[in-house]
Amino acid sequence: MKKPVVVILAVVVLLAAGIGGWLWYQSQQDRGLTLYGNVDIRTLNMSFRVGGRLESLAVDEGDTVKSGQLLGQLDKAPYENALMQAKASVSVAQAQYDLMLAGYRDEEVAQAEAAVKQAKAAYDYSQNFYNRQQGLWKSRTISANDLENARSSRDQAQATLKSAQDKLSQYRTGNRPQDIAQAKANLEQAQAQLAQAELDLHDTTLIAPSNGTLMTRAVEPGSMLSAGSTVLTLSLTRPVWVRAYIDEPNLSQAQPGREILLYTDGRPDKPYHGKIGFVSPTAEFTPKTVETPDLRTDLVYRLRIIVTDADDALRQGMPITVKFNDGEGHE
């Protein structure tokens, strides 16, 4: 009876030891996961939104650049002239719109009334003259050509009278709503052109959008530039990201926010610290830059690791050894 019991106990002990060993192995695998990556290369091509002659550049390759720093200047003269012209156009349009809103002065109405009286008198005279010419033509005293001349004079006087009457009516009732709306639209168009001219002048200066190091100075002062052509290339130094790749079996270990240890060849005993900031939702074939041979034919997921204690020793493109810690700051 004792022998079967001993056998059963031995089997239980072996199973427990096996399970414990497997769990220990898995924990060591998790703690020992190592990836290889590089400090992400992040550059910004800077250009002027408008074209023109490059007047000056204030930086050279290798210079440290601060956000908001003046980097370059185009010749401002053409844009200053355009701004002056736009301001003048706004003044003209504003004056015209104000006139439309104000209507006509009493003096203008009085002048229009006088013009109507004068045109009416001229029309009455031409009508009476035409009537007399008709009687003379019937008695064969004048020719048909004389009668036609009298009719033309009468019709011209009638048209002049109607024009004067229409003008007087307009002066008395004010400008039509359509004319006022047109004047307002002209003013708004001029104001928009002024705003564009101000923006164009502002954009003749090139301002650093971020801290960084100047990598490339593509042109020199005196060059004629088209809008959008690259002038300077800036290497963005903050924040520092490390790009690495992980295979699917280990993907569960790469959770956003997980703390990571980062080693460089120059300081193998003093790691940088980082956190996983992004895990790609889609797999891709391993890029050629990955140094681990057994991953080069696999589908992997890209990781972005944010370095939390970066310094100037971390240069873009530098190879990095990525080691996952156990969550307590230990490798």
From Swiss-Prot:
Cellular component, GO annotation: periplasmic space
InterPro entries named among the record's database cross-references: CusB_D23, UPF0194_membrane_YbhG, UPF0194_transport
Membrane-spanning residues: none
Record key words, sorted: Coiled coil, Periplasm, Signal
Keyword Cell cycle assigned: no
Major place of residence: periplasm
Pfam families: HlyD_D23
Cleaved signal peptide residues: 1-16
Localization annotation: Periplasm
Cell wall biogenesis/degradation among keywords: no
Residues forming coiled coils: 107-208
Family matches, as NCBIfam families: PRK03598.1
Family listed: Belongs to the UPF0194 family.
Protein name: UPF0194 membrane protein Ent638_1286
Organism, scientific name: Enterobacter sp. (strain 638)
